[in-house]
Amino acid sequence: MIRIGHGFDVHKFGGEGPVIIGGVAIPYEQGLIAHSDGDVALHALTDALLGAIAAGDIGRHFPDTDDKWKGANSRELLKDVYRRVKEQGYRLGNADVTIMAQAPKMAPHIDAMCAAIAEDLETDISNINVKATTTERLGFTGRKEGIATEAVVLLFKQ
């Protein structure tokens, strides 16, 4: 059996940098406001995995009303969810992540993001794609108010 999952996340800028995205700390004058570390890429990816196994969303498993998750490392959340994916008998086929941000520039960090995600999902880096785009200065991302990310995953039954 093959399953697909889709995830989406948004965080607004605020406070001190760096911005953590795809498991990588990117120098920037502001950080992202969040209960956890605010890693929009990993949050979208985590939601995609949860969606693929019909297990709800990240907020259900790691609620922002629970102080246990305050400042949580999103790489640990992703690994926890991938453990659940494997427990249900699935393995990752591939993951594709799109980051929508006017700033900071993502291109210099994409390879490191792919490597971190591949490590966390126990897969070859060739199964992970991360790309970034601006919104041509349109909308909240274009005004540099925040960052949005979408992710899709393909899972195969083992």
Curated annotation (Swiss-Prot):
Belongs to the IspF family. 4-CDP-2-C-methyl-D-erythritol 2-phosphate binds at residues 9-11, 35-36, 57-59, 62-66, 101-107, 133-136, 140, 143. The record marks 35, 134 as: Transition state stabilizer. Its EC number is 4.6.1.12. It catalyses: 4-CDP-2-C-methyl-D-erythritol 2-phosphate = 2-C-methyl-D-erythritol 2,4-cyclic diphosphate + CMP. Pfam families: YgbB. Pathway: Isoprenoid biosynthesis; isopentenyl diphosphate biosynthesis via DXP pathway; isopentenyl diphosphate from 1-deoxy-D-xylulose 5-phosphate: step 4/6. GO terms for molecular function: 2-C-methyl-D-erythritol 2,4-cyclodiphosphate synthase activity; metal ion binding. Keywords: Isoprene biosynthesis, Lyase, Metal-binding. Binds 1 divalent metal cation per subunit. It comes from the Bacteria. It is an enzyme of class 4 (lyase). One of its GO terms (biological process) is terpenoid biosynthetic process. This is 2-C-methyl-D-erythritol 2,4-cyclodiphosphate synthase. Its cofactor is a divalent metal cation.
